[in-house]
Amino acid sequence: MEAALRVVRYIKEAPGLGLLMPTGNTTQLTAFCDSDWGACMETRRSVTGYLVKLGEGLISWKSKKQETVSRSSAEAEFRSMAACAAEVTWLIGLYKELGINVSLPVNMVCDSKAAIQIAANPIFHERTKHIDIDCHFVRERIC
């Protein structure tokens, strides 16, 4: 209850702040994902970032250090795609529960040609076997 009162007080004190959603009836989700390879100087873990838009309105975003060290920039980007695909899957389920039909397929934008090729290639090699689970997850969501 205390947390709810705190939120209400914050909203009352800051009436001009907020995220504005553009008007329109588009139901197209667009997702953008990116990562930086080995950015953390202490752990050499990459940082994943993604954002999801419904039409022109930003509805979800996240930036987080990856759980494991990536051995290539393509692997770091691919893990970013997997995190983004998981968020998009959750958002689609949420919108279905709310009775909102989302246009499929969802556009996912990634700036790594290598990560896109890994997602599209049905054959695993020794160099990509360790990201096998993420790869299957992304493939199920984007194909």
Regions found by a protein language model. Give the residues of each.
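Divalent metal-binding acidic/histidine catalytic loops
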Residues: 1-143
